[in-house]
Amino acid sequence: MAEFPASLLILNGKSTDNLPLREAIMLLREEGMTIHVRVTWEKGDAARYVEEARKLGVATVIAGGGDGTINEVSTALIQCEGDDIPALGILPLGTANDFATSVGIPEALDKALKLAIAGDAIAIDMAQVNKQTCFINMATGGFGTRITTETPEKLKAALGSVSYIIHGLMRMDTLQPDRCEIRGENFHWQGDALVIGIGNGRQAGGGQQLCPNALINDGLLQLRIFTGDEILPALVSTLKSDEDNPNIIEGASSWFDIQAPHDITFNLDGEPLSGQNFHIEILPAALRCRLPPDCPLLR
């Protein structure tokens, strides 16, 4: 087979007992591919391993985990300076794998690993919040964010994305919409938001298409707001088609400013960030990512 440059796999510590993954790595090594493996146990590990990857001269750093792991690795990559910055490869091993699913990464580990090593590296956008925190997929706010951040880890491990629905139903009586004001390029809205989705990618929360028109290389963020004064009626209205739904507000901009009279929480690729003021902007062509040729999120 053709020779490929070396890669470094940054593996979330929760996936170390994945026997099929070990077998896939061993098989590719036997075929002549050089794959270094490092395991993360705490925040900051991914950034250190990206630095090591640059010293090793690898062509690809593979994020092995869920959306949070992809976020950590991609954030570390865009902070690199100089030439020969490795491309991002994706190996979906998390609970929801929203970004990997939406860009078309294969579910089979061996196929995903080969794509992460040998796929075409395409320049894609990332987003940044308040000039600090980044996300590659989506920022979600509202009651859905509170559900995903509060759902017990054991429930997520046992039931996957279904756990979010169960926990949400259990909390229905305590959840309230968030009052806020959102501005962007040729966009202004103020009111009660049930759910806010600001997407570089399209889906979050285990497959929910919050921003179905988003592309990862168009220099824009897609905004979708589900509005409503009461949770249950607004939830029922989301079952209608988009054209018939007065509770859906949409917009597109390279930046959005969000202000609220009280603290609201956004979920950035799985990591919560709370505050009253948010400036979210796109970072065009921030990194290269190895993607399938038919990736639906490319223009």
Curated annotation (Swiss-Prot):
Q: What class of enzyme is it?
A: transferase
Family to which the UniProt record says this protein belongs: Belongs to the diacylglycerol/lipid kinase family. YegS lipid kinase subfamily.
Q: Which domain of life is it from?
A: Bacteria
Q: Which UniProt keywords apply?
A: ATP-binding, Cytoplasm, Kinase, Lipid biosynthesis, Lipid metabolism, Magnesium, Metal-binding, Nucleotide-binding, Phospholipid biosynthesis, Phospholipid metabolism, Transferase
Q: What is its main location?
A: cytoplasm
Q: What residue stretches are annotated with the DAGKc domain?
A: 2-133
Query: Record keywords: Cell membrane included?
Result: no
User: Might you name a Gene Ontology BP term for this protein?
Assistant: phospholipid biosynthetic process
Name of protein = Probable lipid kinase YegS
> Which Gene Ontology cellular-component terms appear in the entry?
cytoplasm; plasma membrane
Q: Record keywords: Ion transport included?
A: no
EC number(s) reported in the record:
2.7.1.-
Q: Which SUPFAM superfamilies match?
A: NAD kinase/diacylglycerol kinase-like (SSF111331)
* S-S bonds: none
State the function annotated in the UniProt record: Probably phosphorylates lipids; the in vivo substrate is unknown.
Task: Write down the required cofactor(s).
Answer: Mg(2+); Ca(2+)
What GO MF terms are annotated? Answer: ATP binding; lipid kinase activity; magnesium ion binding
The record's annotation in Pfam families points to: DAGK_cat (PF00781), YegS_C (PF19279)
Q: Which residues form the active site?
A: 271
Annotated ATP binding lies at 40, 66-72, 95
Q: Which organism is it from?
A: Escherichia coli O9:H4 (strain HS)
